[in-house]
Structure formats: structure tokens, C-alpha cells
Amino acid sequence: MRGIRFAILVLLIGFCGTAEVVGADAAADAWKALRAGGHTALMRHADAPGGFGDPPGFRVDDCATQRNLSEKGRADAAKIGARLKLEGIAFEQVLSSPWCRCIDTAMLLNLGTVETEVTFGNVVVLRDQREALTAGARARIAQWSGRGNLLVVTHGANVQALTGISPASGEIVVVKSGSDRAEPVGRLLLD
């Protein structure tokens, strides 16, 4: 029962958060930070219909058992990657949650070699590991010291746990690297 209440709460928060409009200032700040380099871009995977979480009995190592990207999600991911390239934004490293919808989003962005990172795994599904995963993600962001940017494709609940922002599908929240606070500096919702 407790798990169901938690899932409903996270779902409601997610719906509230996706109704937010990304303002021009937040987008301008995000572009400026990414052009300067040394930041982390936390991206929620592109559109993956079918509800919340994953179907019962899903396995991380079997995409057929998970929620996957829709055709719209696949097209959106490719468009977002093209837009980032057009704007001259590059990433030194691209990390992804091990969930297929995140890996597929990262690959369709076509912004570099994609490496899976378990600490960005879905904190809703792995709720018993939420604190450890979030702490690991904060540490990973804090460790980033590249002159370029780090891109992490993960889940909305993970971005929210790190930043307090519940992003829309495909939305990018840019945070300062080198700090374990994952402080947001801007947001991009590209179409």
C-alpha cells in the first residue's frame, strides 16, 4: 500500500511539473552555460507512452519488457540532437540510465558514444535504492571536471530528485558541475 501511495504522489508531482512553461530566461541561461562548457545536462528521456514506471515483470536487460520510445519520441530525440549540434553544443561524455528508453534517446541524439551508468537508473522502480542512486548521481556530477559538457539521459523522477524540477519528456535541465548540489542554471524544452 505504501508503494502505491508513493507512486501516485510521484505521478501527481510529475503531472504538475510538466505543466510548467520553460521561460525565455531559463532557456537563455541554459544555452549560455552549455556554450561556456563545464556543465552537466540532465535530460529526461523522450516520449515513452504506457503510463508510469514499467510493466510488472520488466527486466532492465530486455527492452521488450519495458516501456519504450514512441515514434514521436524517436523523432523528437533525433530533432533535439540536431538542434544541439546546430547551436554548436558538444558533449565530452554521454551517459545514460541502463533503461532502454534512455539508451535509445541518447543514441538517437547522435552526440557521442553512449555509456550506461547504473547510478542514473530509475529511482521510482528502484525506490528502495533511491537515496543511494541519487547520492551516486550527485557524486558523478560533482566529479565532472571536463572543459566540455556532460550529458546524462535519465528519468524524470531522477532529475527531480537531483534538482527539484520535474521535466517534460525530452526536456534538459542544465546544472553546475563540480558541486554535489546539482544546482540548476537553466532549462531547455526543444521541439
Q: Where do the model's predicted regions map?
A:
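Sec/Tat signal peptide C-region and signal peptidase I cleavage site
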Residues: T18-G23
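Positively charged n-region of N-terminal signal peptides that target proteins for export
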Residues: M1-R5
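Generic beta-sheet signal
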Residues: G38-T40, G146-T154
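A short, structured loop/turn motif at beta-sheet edges
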Residues: Q143-G148, S177-G178
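Active-site-proximal alpha-helix that buttresses catalytic centers in soluble enzyme cores
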Residues: D25-E115, V123-R127, A135, I165-D191
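A short, acidic, amphipathic alpha-helical segment used as a generic capping/interface helix at domain edges
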Residues: T134-W144
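Bacterial N-terminal signal peptides
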Residues: A7-G17
